[in-house]
Amino acid sequence: MKKKIEIYIGILFLLLCGICAIGKDAFVTARDGRQEEVAYTNDYGGVGTGDLLPGTVVTQTVWVTDYDLTKIAVRFATMGRINRGQLEVSLENRTTGEILGNWTVNTEELVDYGYKEFEIDADKTQLSLENELAISVSCKEASEGEYVTIVRSQNDVLQGELTVNENEMSGDMSLRLYNRIHFGFLKKIYFVLASILYLITALALYIIMFRSGRISIKYYFLIFAGVLGMVYLFILPPFSSPDELCHFGRAYSWANYLTGKEPVQGTFAEFLTEEERASLIKATDKPSLATYAKMYGGYGQTPLKVEENSFHELQGAEIEYRPTNTPFSYAPQILAIMIGKCIGLSFWKVVYLARLLNFFVYTLLIFAAVCIMPKYRILMICIALWPMTLEQLASCSYDSMILGLAFLFIANWLRLMEKKSLYTVWDLAAEIMLVFLIASCKPFYAPLILLCAALPKENFRKGWRKGFWISFLLPVILGILYFEREVIKDVLTGSNVAWGDPELEGMTIRDVVLHPLRIIKMFFNTLLRNGQWYLYSAVGSELGWLEIRPSAVLIMGFIGTTVLSVIPAENETEKNFNKERMISLEVFVLSVFCIMGTLLLSSTYKTAEIIGGVQGRYFIPVLPLLCIALRGKRIRIEKNIDEKLICSMWILNFLVLIDVFRIISVR
């Protein structure tokens, strides 16, 4: 009894620490008038506008994205030269003709490829969304041969024009726009009270579970995933998860397509109308509590209703929403969108319904995986409770569906490895269906099918093994060729780079064949430079676009707890131990090679030194295989510590949520 009281006191202390941390930030940031970035130019691979010679004027027009603009920032490049001169910077509201600010810049103060910030007079910051601004930079004087330049993007990414001496130029000036945060002290207190209510509820659940005695480990996961997932679902603004907006747009296209809607003929020739596209593009503003204000304003409106004057936001918007991806990974979202449209839900209600169904399906898939696994249950639970996976399950990301299917496939494979009787048709059909769905959604997970090569031969009925492999490989290959035909075409021809400038040449298979040593070097450079970041980000070191970065100590805590979950207890016996380890390691290495190889051919420029587009979350579906491969027999734990590991994951997630509450409450 004394030990339990000590545990409760310790958890209560952590609870009070979290409340104090949230309250402190709520009080301080309510008084300091903090600002946040609301729009920026993605200047990846940026170039200059040309030397700013005396008399040169560079102007960028941009539409207002927020009512209360407080600051702008322009990115300059000095090319390593010291310039003794002056620049004039002005900001004009072209709609009203009002000058919002004039500034003089000494070029000696500029930092190479750094942003120079310009504060706007507080009396002139109240704008309207239909206002057009013009940012002009002119060179007043400069020392000869030592000129500076303004960084610009190679593509048109803003809704405006870039001109040099009134001559139009491609791309856009590298800018950042800021607004004042309007989340006052009283609202912050409400936010803190909501956080406290959650933490008290969670603590009550924790106490009830431990007072009730020993329960199955799978129910621990169901309760913890449910509580934590719902918190992430409502605490993180819509579209704050990586690529969430893009996936929601594709799901919306699929919903229109499956309900027999004709494609829109015109600029985009898609299954989204201009009104639908405008609503989605409007939601791409950097997520913050301003997003909640938009939601509140449009919560009762008809589906995808937008302001009449917002269609200028379509200018230059080249967001890809074609239903070229398989619909399987979007199934929960498609169902939610179809239901929402049928009953007339508003845009944001549809978004949250899609999030909720995605969360529900993912949780059921992981729960099913944990239920059928004969061992490694705690390992699967630990990875499923990482902050990154929790963020994905509570968003519209299609990665959550793929992750759930991959975990279920691995769980069923382990069950078949341990099975003593002959395999039934349903046993093998389940594996075939799961790997078909996984490979159709993301082909670089296709190596998972090789796990079945380790299945004991004696468990197959006579003649079944050969037929099993034919039934296995044929649908997987056909699924990849059909659903990913556009991607395969781009990879084979090198005609497109997914996350870059389509005008730049991408890597092709021909480059791989002609320069194998360079490709090997790129693989090693990528892993050596970014390997640690891939691991940390897979756990949750960077959550979405909100710059939520939990402490490195917490990330190491998640990794350490996951490693402990692999160590067997003394009373555990192993069947096919060495075979499982070897095949798991081989499939993991091959999967990593396929992931990086696919991104090499689809997202990497010919001039790049490392492979582009690789993200830590791509490795999560195959990470259990690495952990199984690292499992040994020599190191053992005296008794089962599964419940203690679950408690560790709960405490670590509690501390991460303190960070999430703290960062969200200051925005």
List where the protein language model places each region.
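Membrane-lumen/periplasm interface segments of multi-pass, membrane-embedded glycan/lipid transferases
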Residues: F185-K188, F483-E570
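Membrane-interface alpha helices of multi-pass inner-membrane proteins
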Residues: E391, D427-P443, L448-A454
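Short acidic/glycine- and proline-prone juxtamembrane loop motifs at membrane-interface regions
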Residues: S395-I402
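Transmembrane-helix signature of polytopic, membrane-embedded enzymes
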Residues: S216, L345-W348, F367-P387
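Perimembrane helix-loop-helix junctions
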Residues: N412-L422, A446-I477
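Interfacial juxtamembrane loops and adjacent helix segments
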Residues: L258-L353
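Transmembrane-helix motifs of polytopic, lipid-linked glycan transferases
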Residues: L205-Y206, Y352-K375
